[in-house]
């Protein structure tokens, strides 16, 4: 056996999550590993009929202070920190026996404090002290000691012991050490973030400041990327430790080439836009901007309508659907155009089978979920901008009619549709829509009136008529020229935030043209 393999003869098990505990303990006992344990863990092992020695018996000190002190003892930490070939004499002198394996997971601080009714006292009692101390001791001494922090690690740990006659490799011990230090860092960050957000420690259930004096973030790498935004930039994708269900980070790639930085940025824009619709919808995104969006009777209908908005820009785009993608729609897409990424909550067997004919197309499955990100962040030079996420919806009852003519029922439906799309278009954003489909999109211009003209131009290029359509603007019109441009194109109704110093002039312009206009009181800048 290679010298970097070391036997496991003595293990200390102390876990709050009992998942897989008994199977692990039974496998270790079968290899004649002596088990040490504490409190509820020892009780569970003993009730399973397995031999275990209490840490209190080892140290000669009982668990005290309601369990706050039980493993903070030289006989425990010396057993974890003792170095092979260096500390044997000292350990023998003080009666310290080596511990070769530590299996420990921490008090559930994160899951306790995520509850809105969590009291400060509950939070404090779930701050583990002895656990992180032992993890650090064992992880520091990876040259001799192995440490497991998660039930998901048990199977690989036992497999290596089985394959190597009860021994673990240096590579395995080091990998487990890194995972342990990461876990301690995550745990301490969660405690720091929670306590930093407590606005008043005198409150039983403290109010939490959404923007505390200090924040600590932890992300897990999902994959390396081919490159960053440009080929001369390197890149990788990381996800939150606890990703929100239904968001992009929960995707499963079913086929296709490796994802790029731009693929993921565009995919996020497409997915977030499409998941706000209840009826079958398709969103086509290019360079983080929707170039076609539609709601239809099914995926195929929605795709045809969305594609018709801007067939030229749809080349090399990202397509997102909010319903299971069927074979007929998959065939229609892949036979017609080059696609970078397909996204849907699921695919029928025929759709996946047909997609294999275009092996390079990246096919992503994102399970349904109603969760929303609470915050957005953006890096700037040596700093971080942080804000609450723009999750503001809009209902008919919130709209204020400000013109002489009120929108018709059909126009109101189209106005809300266009408003939802405009939220995901780069500012200055103008969206023309009719019958729950986009007719033209003007994005990212420094002048709002220019965005309006571009939306009309895109409609003309696609041979779609703007006459009778509605217009959504992500921010107010500073002058009447945007309304005049809309009227020239044939727009019949407008939705916008309002709030300009010249709202009166803008409203008067709409009345002159017989345009119905509603204010939302909400702006949707997107940069």
UniProtKB/Swiss-Prot annotation:
Q: Which family does it belong to?
A: Belongs to the PurH family.
Q: Which reaction does it catalyse?
A: (6R)-10-formyltetrahydrofolate + 5-amino-1-(5-phospho-beta-D-ribosyl)imidazole-4-carboxamide = 5-formamido-1-(5-phospho-D-ribosyl)imidazole-4-carboxamide + (6S)-5,6,7,8-tetrahydrofolate; IMP + H2O = 5-formamido-1-(5-phospho-D-ribosyl)imidazole-4-carboxamide
Pfam families registered for this protein in UniProt: AICARFT_IMPCHas, MGS
HAMAP family named in the record:
PurH (MF_00139)
| Domain MGS-like positions | 1-149
Q: What is known of its domains?
A: The IMP cyclohydrolase activity resides in the N-terminal region.
Would the keyword NAD be found if you checked this record's keyword annotation? no
- Designated name of the protein: Bifunctional purine biosynthesis protein PurH
| Keyword list, A-Z | Hydrolase, Multifunctional enzyme, Purine biosynthesis, Transferase
């Amino acid at each position: 056996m290679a010298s970097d393999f070391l036997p496991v003869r003595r293990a200390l098990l102390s876990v709050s999550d009992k998942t897989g505990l008994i199977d692990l303990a039974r496998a270790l006992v079968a290899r004649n590993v002596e088990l040490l344990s504490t409190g509820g863990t020892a009780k569970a092992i003993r009730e399973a009929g397995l031999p275990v020695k209490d840490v209190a018996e080892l140290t000669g000190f009982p668990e005290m202070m309601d369990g706050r002190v039980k493993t903070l003892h030289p006989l425990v930490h010396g057993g974890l920190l003792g170095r092979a070939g260096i500390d044997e004499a000292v350990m023998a002198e003080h009666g310290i026996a080596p511990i070769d394996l530590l299996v420990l997971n921490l008090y559930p601080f994160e899951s306790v404090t995520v509850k809105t009714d969590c009291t400060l006292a509950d939070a404090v009692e779930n701050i583990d002290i002895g656990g992180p101390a032992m993890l650090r001791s064992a992880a520091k001494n990876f040259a001799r000691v192995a440490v497991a922090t998660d039930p998901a690690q048990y199977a690989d740990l036992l497999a290596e012991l089985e394959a190597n006659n009860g021994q673990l490799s240096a590579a395995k011990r080091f990998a487990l050490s890194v995972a342990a230090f990461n876990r301690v860092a995550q745990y301490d960050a969660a405690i720091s973030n929670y306590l930093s957000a407590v606005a008043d420690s005198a409150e039983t259930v403290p109010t939490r400041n959404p923007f505390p004096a200090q924040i600590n973030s932890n992300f897990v790498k999902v994959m390396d990327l081919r490159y960053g935004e440009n080929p001369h930039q390197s890149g990788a994708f990381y996800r939150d430790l606890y990703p929100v269900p239904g968001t992009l980070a929960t995707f499963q790639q079913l086929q296709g080439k490796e994802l790029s930085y731009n693929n993921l940025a565009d995919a996020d824009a497409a997915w977030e836009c499409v998941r706000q619709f209840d009826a079958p919808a398709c969103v086509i995104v290019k360079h983080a901007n929707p170039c076609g969006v539609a709601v239809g009777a099914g995926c195929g209908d929605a795709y045809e309508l969305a594609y018709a908005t801007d067939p030229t820009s749809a080349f090399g785009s990202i397509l997102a659907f909010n319903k299971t993608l069927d074979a007929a729609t998959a065939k229609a897409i892949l036979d017609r155009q080059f696609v970078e990424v397909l996204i849907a909550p699921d695919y029928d067997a025929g759709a996946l089978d047909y997609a294999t004919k275009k092996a390079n197309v990246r096919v992503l499955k994102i399970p349904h979920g109603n969760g929303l990100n609470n915050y957005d962040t953006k890096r700037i030079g040596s700093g971080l901008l942080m804000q609450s996420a723009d999750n503001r919806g809009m209902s008919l009852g919130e709209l204020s009619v400000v013109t002489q003519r009120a929108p018709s029922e059909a126009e109101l439906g189209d106005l809300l549709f266009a408003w939802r799309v405009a939220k995901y278009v780069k500012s200055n954003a103008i969206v023309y829509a009719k019958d729950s489909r986009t007719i033209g999109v003007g994005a990212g211009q420094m002048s709002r009136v220019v965005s309006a003209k571009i939306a009309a131009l895109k409609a003309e290029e696609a041979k779609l008529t703007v006459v009778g359509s509605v217009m959504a603007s992500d921010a107010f019109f500073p002058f009447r020229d945007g309304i005049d441009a809309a009227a020239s194109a044939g727009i019949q109704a407008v939705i916008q935030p309002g709030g300009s110093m010249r709202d009166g002039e803008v409203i008067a312009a709409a009345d002159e043209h017989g345009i119905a206009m509603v204010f939302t009181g909400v702006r949707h800048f997107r940069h």
